[in-house]
UniProtKB/Swiss-Prot annotation:
Designated name of the protein: Homoserine kinase
Keyword Transferase: yes
Organism: Crocosphaera subtropica (strain ATCC 51142 / BH68) (Cyanothece sp. (strain ATCC 51142))
Binding site for ATP: P94, L95, A96, R97, G98, L99, G100, S101, S102, A103, T104
UniProt-listed Gene3D superfamilies: 3.30.230.10, GHMP kinase, C-terminal domain
Lineage of the organism: Bacteria, Bacillati, Cyanobacteriota, Cyanophyceae, Oscillatoriophycideae
Function: Catalyzes the ATP-dependent phosphorylation of L-homoserine to L-homoserine phosphate.
Catalytic activity: L-homoserine + ATP = O-phospho-L-homoserine + ADP + H(+)
Cellular component terms (Gene Ontology): cytoplasm
Subcellular localization, as worded in the UniProt entry: Cytoplasm
Pathway given in the UniProt record: Amino-acid biosynthesis; L-threonine biosynthesis; L-threonine from L-aspartate: step 4/5
Length: 308
């Protein structure tokens, strides 16, 4: 069996929930982190991590690094000793912004380790390990597989369904210059929910799937509403209602919190991209908040491996 000594794994950012699909729907976006793993059997140390990118100084360079923890987790799963490794990280996905940066690290570490170990695990097995590490599937599944994915199941029994995404639906992300941790965003959620709120989301979840597939503007506008998590989280994001109103006025189908936030995701028609981008950026500018606003596409490849 041929073992590669160097492998590069490119993993897309993801946007999770898309309104009513709390903890079960996510889509891969054309924004990436890149991880290069090089075995160094003669090195003096077991681990060397180099990070480049605008937030490189915030990424751990030791064994606490999530990427390395995922990397070693796969070897532990195989009952093998991890190799001495040099890891080069190129950051393109903002940290703690609701765009699945942790999922890129988990998928990157697992896929990189699997490649260097000789591909002993299937994609499905890697996915199960990733879900177990992350605790929920909505980011790691599309990060691994690409496209928009619905994940249903528990423990090691998962059914994954790709949701078709109509070409007339363009994601626009507004990434503010402040952070919101997933832990903080989950802490504000209630312990119990009413039947009415559950039914509200069940109905819109079904409509969301059909709206994404068909591109029906009216359906999409109604389907992006939610009562399970967004009403409790939007207070953590300064300017949420103002940015949302501005996006809708500019022609967006709807706007939601991307993952746990604070990034806001608008979906719009291709002809409205510029007006929606401008409206969302101007709204936050009026509140003296700097935001990176850009349109993206749906990534269809997922984690991409290049051995060299």
């Amino acid at each position: 069996m041929f073992f590669m000594s160097t492998v590069t794994v490119t993993v897309p950012a993801t946007t999770a929930n898309i309104g009513p699909g709390f903890d079960c729907i996510g889509a891969a976006l054309t924004l990436y982190n890149q991880f290069t793993f090089t075995e160094q059997p003669e090195a003096d140390t077991d681990l060397r991590i180099t990070v480049t990118g605008t937030e490189a100084h915030r990424v751990s360079g030791d064994r606490t690094n999530l990427l390395y923890q995922a990397f070693t987790h796969l070897y532990d799963h195989l009952n093998k000793t991890p190799p001495k490794i040099a890891i080069d990280i190129k950051l393109g996905v903002p940290l703690a912004r609701g765009l699945g940066s942790s999922a890129t690290a988990i998928i990157g570490g697992l896929v990189g380790a699997n490649e260097l170990a000789g591909q002993p695990l299937s994609t499905a097995e890697i996915m199960e390990l990733a879900i177990a590490i992350e605790g929920h599937p909505d980011n790691v599944v599309p990060a691994l597989l690409g496209n928009c994915q619905l994940s249903v199941g528990e423990a090691e029994n998962w059914e994954i369904c790709q949701i078709p995404w109509h070409s007339d639906i363009i994601p626009v992300v507004a990434i503010p210059d402040f952070e919101l941790s997933t832990e903080e965003a989950r802490a504000v959620l209630p312990k119990t929910l009413s039947y009415g709120d559950a039914i509200f989301n069940i109905a819109r979840m079904g409509l969301l799937i059909r709206a994404l597939e068909s591109g029906n503007e009216q359906w999409l506008n109604k389907a992006m509403a939610d009562k399970l998590h967004q009403p409790y989280r939007q207070g953590l994001i300064e300017g949420y209602e103002f940015v949302q109103a501005s996006a809708l006025k500019a022609g967006a189908y709807g706007m939601v919190i991307s993952g746990a936030g604070p990034t806001l995701l608008a979906l719009t028609h291709p002809e409205k991209i510029q007006s929606v981008e401008k409206a969302m950026k101007n709204a936050w500018t009026q509140l003296e908040i700097v935001a990176d606003v850009r349109s993206l596409s749906i990534d269809t490849q997922g984690a991409n491996v290049n051995a060299h």
